[in-house]
Amino acid sequence: MSTPKGKNDQALIAIVDDDQSFREALGNLLRLIGFRTAIFASARNFLDSPQFPNVSCAILDVSMPRMDGLELQRHLVATHPIPIIFITDLRDAKTREQAVGAGAISFLNKPVSEKTLIGALNSALSA
């Protein structure tokens, strides 16, 4: 199993995805490779969480009810800038351009390999 560069046990990674099985599997994987995680079923749950101010990086889905990932990204950029990685089923270029244009570190498609994910996290945490 790969490990993150300069394994950072202090980094808190937020996973915001309405797909319960995906967010739990991703949370388990990240904990196995040395990250602390906090998982949320919605953007609102994330923003209302007491853990929110301590998050080092957010992994977001694009398609979520009520507030989607792009809306959450805009909110974070305006109020609490942290590195953002999108992991999504969406494969359209316009959405990718919007996310990256607004500052996302990476825009990855599900399923994502562990190696690709670790590379994105290393980039995000060194940004």
Residues covered by each model-derived region:
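Non-catalytic signal-transmission and effector/linker regions of two-component phosphorelay proteins
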Residues: M1-A14, Q20-F22, G27, K115-A127
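Conserved Asp/Asn-Gly motif in the active-site loop of CheY-like receiver
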Residues: F40-R44
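Active-site beta3 strand of CheY-like receiver
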Residues: P53-I59
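Active-site residues of response regulator receiver
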Residues: D61, T88
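Receiver (REC) domain active-site loop signature in two-component systems and cognate sites
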Residues: M64
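A Lys-centered signature of the CheY-like receiver
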Residues: K110
